[in-house]
């Protein structure tokens, strides 16, 4: 939906869309995303060393670039040094919410109310952040190939990461397919 959204009248949103969609295709932390340059693209792969990973566990992450991610990069080939024309993180997060609202992405999500520690339902466009891209990357891959080690190798998570386990949602369709495998 987002990749093909017509944002011709909103160039600011078009840039946010491109950054967010690219982010959903590569799944890195936003800090790593902002550090990327053209030098991080090698033979159709995005290659980088995660910044937040503990030094003793640090290893290079290689993510094959989807055709749509490559097309987004083509739009910004003349960007100055950086891979994409990044905005300050708070502007990026506000832009993501504005983009989702503009595109009518209003799926209700359950979040934890930090004041009363109760769960509340809110439209995605009110709560989405750059982290939503990382979660989307892991969730989409996990629905296709539920192999935590393979996915973690592309998201930069270390084995046994609690954060990684939170991203993996097992939906009803996955459960249905699993039951159908039983003879």
Residue spans for each PLM region:
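Exposed loop/turn and edge beta-strand positions of beta-sandwich/beta-sheet ligand-binding modules
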Residues: 16, 59, 67, 90, ...
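Short, polar N-cap/turn motifs at the start of nucleic acid-interacting alpha helices
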Residues: 39-45, 146-166
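Basic, Lys/Arg- and aromatic-enriched nucleic-acid-binding interface segment
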Residues: 1-30, 34, 88-91
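Conserved tyrosine-mediated DNA breakage-rejoining catalytic core shared by Y-recombinases
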Residues: 2, 26, 35-74
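Short, basic (Lys/Arg/His-rich) helix/loop patches that form interaction surfaces
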Residues: 7-13, 78-82, 97-153, 157
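Catalytic-site neighborhood detector that most strongly recognizes the C-terminal catalytic loop/helix
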Residues: 50-54, 89-92, 155-180
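C-terminal structural cap/anchor segments
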Residues: 63-64, 82-89
């Amino acid at each position: 939906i987002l990749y093909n959204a017509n944002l011709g009248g909103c160039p600011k949103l078009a840039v946010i869309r491109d950054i967010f969609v690219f982010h959903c295709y590569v799944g890195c932390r936003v800090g790593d995303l902002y550090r990327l340059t053209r030098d991080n693209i090698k033979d159709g792969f995005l290659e980088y060393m995660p910044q937040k990973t503990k030094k003793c566990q640090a290893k290079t992450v290689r993510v094959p670039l989807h055709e749509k991610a490559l097309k987004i990069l083509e739009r910004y080939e003349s960007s100055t040094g950086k891979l994409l024309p990044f905005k300050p993180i708070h502007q990026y997060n506000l832009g993501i919410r504005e983009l989702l609202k503009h595109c009518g992405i209003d799926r209700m999500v359950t979040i934890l109310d930090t004041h009363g520690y109760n769960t509340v339902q809110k439209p995605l466009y009110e709560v989405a952040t750059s982290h939503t891209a990382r979660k989307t990357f892991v969730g989409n891959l996990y629905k296709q190939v539920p192999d935590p080690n393979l996915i973690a190798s592309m998201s930069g998570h270390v084995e046994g990461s609690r954060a990684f386990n939170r991203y993996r949602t097992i939906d009803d369709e996955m459960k249905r397919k699993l039951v159908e495998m039983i003879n």
